[in-house]
Amino acid sequence: MRFLAATILLLALVAASQAEPLHFKDCGSKVGVIKEVNVSPCPTDPCQLHKGQSYSVNITFTSGTQSQNSTALVHGILEGIRVPFPIPEPDGCKSGINCPIQKDKVYSYLNKLPVKNEYPSIKLVVEWKLEDDKKNNLFCWEIPVQITS
């Protein structure tokens, strides 16, 4: 099981290392500072997300607090309406972060963004938050995306 987890982590790191840093909007990182946001593959702005594919997400950030755990929340925002966007692993401590989280330490958060075939072909904003154990945002970022066939 550890070998499988290590292999997945290695593949995510390789994919993330080939990604270009994205221009993102910080949407309220209260107890952390985002250093870099990478979504791979995402060669254009806005990101073209193709239905049926999964995208690697790598966020490098510095924690401004201690926390025993962390939870990711992802939403699609369309005309001001926030719709939950399910991700495979909402537990930040299982997404490249060694918990407990320490203050002033740099972390690389790794996850996947699956784009389901049943999603409509639309433009929207993806909002991705990682909350600490007190529900404060370790990071919060937004990027515009286009879901396509």
Swiss-Prot record:
Effect of Q48A: Strongly decreased cholesterol export
Phenotypic consequence of N58A: Decreased cholesterol binding. Strongly decreased cholesterol transport activity
Glycosylation sites: N58, N69
Example GO BP: cholesterol storage
Known outcome of mutating H50A: Strongly decreased cholesterol export
A GO molecular function held by the record: enzyme binding
Transmembrane segments: none
Annotated consequence of substituting K51A: Decreased cholesterol binding. Strongly decreased cholesterol transport activity
Maturation and modification: N-glycosylated.
Sites bearing N6-acetyllysine, chain numbering: K116
Broad class of the protein's primary localization: secreted
Pfam entry (one): E1_DerP2_DerF2
Reaction(s) catalysed by this chain's protein: cholesterol(in) = cholesterol(out)
Function of the protein: Intracellular cholesterol transporter which acts in concert with NPC1 and plays an important role in the egress of cholesterol from the lysosomal compartment. Unesterified cholesterol that has been released from LDLs in the lumen of the late endosomes/lysosomes is transferred by NPC2 to the cholesterol-binding pocket in the N-terminal domain of NPC1. May bind and mobilize cholesterol that is associated with membranes. NPC2 binds cholesterol with a 1:1 stoichiometry. Can bind a variety of sterols, including lathosterol, desmosterol and the plant sterols stigmasterol and beta-sitosterol.
Family, similarity comment: Belongs to the NPC2 family.
Identification of the protein by name: NPC intracellular cholesterol transporter 2
Organism encoding this protein: Mus musculus (Mouse)
Lineage: Eukaryota, Metazoa, Chordata, Craniata, Vertebrata
